[in-house]
Amino acid sequence: MKDVILIANAGSSSLKISIFEIQNKQVKDKIYNIFLEKNDNKILCYINKKQESATDIKDDAIEMMIDLFEDWWKKQENLNLIATGHRIVHGGKNFNKPVIVNEKVSEDLRVLIPLNPLHQPYNLQVLDLFLQKYKEIVHIACFDTSFHFTNPPITKAFGLPKKYYAKGIIRYGFHGLSYKYVSSHFKEMTKEDLPIKTIIAHLGSGSSLCAIKNGLSLTSSMGFSVLDGVMMGTRTGNIDPGIVLYLIDHEKMTTKEITELLYKKSGLLGISGESSDIRTLLASNSPDAKFAIDLFVYRIVLEIGKLTAALEGIDGLIFTAGVGQNSAVIREMISAKLSWLGIKIDDTKNQKNEHLISTESSKVKVFAVPTNEELIIAEEVIKFL
């Protein structure tokens, strides 16, 4: 029988479960990749990318996903579950490292739901269901915000009265599990040391950038919420707060309507009127699609300039996540606007998605590497075994 750990990553309409085999307190292999998603009135279940079932939704979708997983799990007689790990997007001011989840921890995390309504409720719903169903094993919460606890106070503060800082209205930063994976596995992937002053660009449906100095987070593009920073698939990125006040006072929009607008109807989707998927927009002939891509690139270039200033220089630029790792076109567009930094891209290496894509004469080394949030969570979980 194989000892395994389960890694869960829940969203509002999907649940990703990765199952890793463990030997001698080391992660050996990922043996199952399970993806459940809500699609119209059904829940689709994929195991190792093959669709296994389509079930009518009759109850709470997330609970049904867990039940479907359990039905499958009961048939896996050769697997012994010894622990679970959970991606929790927001750890607030107190959770600076992974923790074993108990009732107190669960309560403390629930208090943070208003800070991240997009992810936190579903992260915690799945965590609580596993706590109820598998009481005899340990359950570990790993936080996207923890990586940024090394940020100095000057990078966390907003220009609000001091009492709000004390209440936790600060810049937290997100995508920390991705940044931790890339920075800690960088040499293994590229055979190079992580540059001293590095910017990692995590570009996907949600996007952010992080300035890393000597392997530690200095500051990042996302702040109090996952809305901040660069424009994303359906999220605005950074906007003037006066816009929100205007929408309330003059457009008579409710906070619920504004939340829907900022989180789900803006970004690439809102600008293009077509899609939140960068591949679809790159293939489109629509002027609005082109403008959406140009704005996406422009905002990223501005952010790289800001983070370079925070680092007081830059030695390395690393692209990662779905768009960052796989879109040679977007990497080229961004890099072309950074020639003032001495960045030069090797077109052949870039098109082949090689890890090192800059030329030998480039003053900044540029890389494209995968991220693996599930694996970094698994590596954290085994530290508790």
UniProtKB/Swiss-Prot annotation:
Keywords: ATP-binding, Cytoplasm, Kinase, Magnesium, Metal-binding, Nucleotide-binding, Transferase. One of its GO terms (cellular component) is cytoplasm. It catalyses: acetate + ATP = acetyl phosphate + ADP. GO terms for biological process: acetate metabolic process; acetyl-CoA biosynthetic process. GO terms for molecular function: acetate kinase activity; ATP binding; magnesium ion binding. Pathway: Metabolic intermediate biosynthesis; acetyl-CoA biosynthesis; acetyl-CoA from acetate: step 1/2. This is Acetate kinase. It comes from Rickettsia akari (strain Hartford). The gene is ackA.
